[in-house]
Amino acid sequence: MAFAHFVLIHTICHGAWIWHKLKPLLEALGHKVTALDLAASGVDPRQIEEIGSFDEYSEPLLTFLEALPPGEKVILVGESCGGLNIAIAADKYCEKIAAAVFHNSVLPDTEHCPSYVVDKLMEVFPDWKDTTYFTYTKDGKEITGLKLGFTLLRENLYTLCGPEEYELAKMLTRKGSLFQNILAKRPFFTKEGYGSIKKIYVWTDQDEIFLPEFQLWQIENYKPDKVYKVEGGDHKLQLTKTKEIAEILQEVADTYN
């Protein structure tokens, strides 16, 4: 059994806390696990209005990878919109990434602008229910921010999670942004960087926000090296199918680490 260093990457409006069930399980198996708070997320003191792009939002991940000792490699695990953080990081530090796991996640490609998969998500799932939106200006650019609605959280993200998990999400989610208009003008992700890393895609057809239509489209659009389909669960597989995700990550470590 191989041991790996997993770096867990949360989605927008969330924080490292989303991994609280998976992290100790992986550590009990002997793995090293780092769960990061991205900019203006979790306990990071910045506010989203201070952040002007998905790249700036990814700064804690980039800083972490920069500081890794020479020769050390990690396995990135990104949930939901965390796939964009993976792509940004891989373009800068592909030599430090043994593999990347996309957990019910956006899967960017290298043939279209970085907003391409987000645009498709919005086409497939346009109604974010009671989510509230606002605009702010950073570096002369108008950015749309959002605060996830409690109905959306319960019905579409934490669909099968227990009441405690849902309460945690209501208490700890913060304002965030998809930076969709900024991503639309960002340079494409590169074949030499992001395109060169091993990609593992994990999904369930019971996801109520990343619908099967969207997930199957992503798999076809930018074929990953390996696909795992989890039976049951919801958008937050790390909470509803924790054991199954840990088993998949062990297999990833055995294969790619």
UniProtKB/Swiss-Prot annotation:
Q: Where does 2-hydroxy-2-methylpropanenitrile bind?
A: T11, S80, K236
- Annotated binding of acetone, by residue: T11, S80
Q: Which reaction does it catalyse?
A: a monosubstituted aliphatic (S)-hydroxynitrile = an aldehyde + hydrogen cyanide; a disubstituted aliphatic (S)-hydroxynitrile = a ketone + hydrogen cyanide; an aromatic (S)-hydroxynitrile = an aromatic aldehyde + hydrogen cyanide; 2-hydroxy-2-methylpropanenitrile = acetone + hydrogen cyanide
In short, the EC number is 4.1.2.47
Q: Ranges for the AB hydrolase-1 domain? A: 5-241
What does altering H235A do?
A: Loss of catalytic activity
Name of the featured protein? (S)-hydroxynitrile lyase
Write down the species. Hevea brasiliensis (Para rubber tree)
